[in-house]
Design a protein with these regions (language model features):
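Extracellular adhesion/carbohydrate-recognition regions
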Residues: 7-107, 145, 150-155, 170-180
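C-terminal, surface-exposed recognition/capping segments
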Residues: 112-184
């Protein structure tokens, strides 16, 4: 299995026209309230698992996430009702298994054993405590954002210690950082 420091989790989002009226790259800088207008990640105290939430459906159209369609549900987020699709981080790993291999400089789909090993590490709380996601928003499109979540070992005294990998240097991308937090 690859070293987790060499893995990027790649989630490609396609949103409905509902997101056009919002600033899709807005984000708070507070780690505990990490939230952006088209998605969220927060601890689920009942299950002790993190939840990845994709928000942006207007209720008439299903979400398209990594080419797969999902029907949204109504849920209260940050005190207001939103149409959302949610997964645990472990589910997201299994549903969207596309990774970036730094040593070979290419995208690849890992084998089942690798996915199961990563899922076990999440179960056993051996996954890195902090997971950073980089939000890249293309200037030319209001419908699509690309998420790169990098699983890395972070210096506890410097949670901002990380590096970035631009997936397309030919386009003008806006770069924002979202902190994904894993419950220890």
């Amino acid at each position: 299995m690859m070293n987790l420091q060499q893995i990027y989790v790649y989630l490609k989002e396609s949103f409905t026209k509902k997101t056009q009226g919002r600033k899709t790259n807005d984000i708070t800088k507070t780690a505990d309230k990490a939230f952006y207008s088209v998605g969220d990640y927060f601890p689920n105290k009942e299950s002790r698992e993190g939840i990845v939430v994709f928000d942006g459906s207007d209720g008439r159209h299903p979400f398209t996430i990594c080419g797969m369609k999902f029907q949204a549900m109504t849920k209260k987020c940050k005190g207001e009702e939103k149409r959302v699709v949610e997964f645990t981080f472990k589910e997201a790993l299994r549903k969207f298994p596309t990774f970036f291999n730094h040593s070979k400089d290419e995208w690849y789909i890992p084998c089942a054993e690798e996915l199961e090993q990563m899922a076990r590490m999440v179960d056993e709380k051996k996954f890195p405590a902090r997971i950073f996601a980089h939000l890249w928003s293309c200037e030319e499109s209001d419908f699509m954002s690309t998420y790169l979540a990098k699983s890395i070992s972070i210096c506890s005294t410097n949670p901002a210690c990380h590096d970035c990998h631009c997936i397309d240097s030919k386009k003008e991308w806006k770069h924002k950082v979202l902190l994904f937090r894993q419950i220890n």
